[in-house]
Amino acid sequence: MSDKPSDAEILEGLGEIVEEVAGVSPDDVTADKSFVDDLDIDSLSMVEIAVQAEDRFGVKIPDDELANLKTVGDAVNYVSKNI
């Protein structure tokens, strides 16, 4: 499984997804940013981001886990551990 993306690649991918879903510049999508407080992403957009991340990275993000992904870094770590 050497094709596993690096955390930087996951972050870049999430940045592209967030841009598509919420119109936020990928440059603003950094590991320390809160989806809600810093990037102004609502719960409906978070579900769409999760669906696209599942498709892109081949992971499953259950609703109860999605609620725990407060920051971009949380999402990167979750994807990295579950890929």
Protein language model regions, located:
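Two-component histidine kinase catalytic core, primarily the HATPase_c
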Residues: 45
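Thiotemplate assembly-line natural product biosynthesis machinery
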Residues: 2-27, 82
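AMP-binding/adenylate-forming catalytic domain of the ANL superfamily
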Residues: 64-73
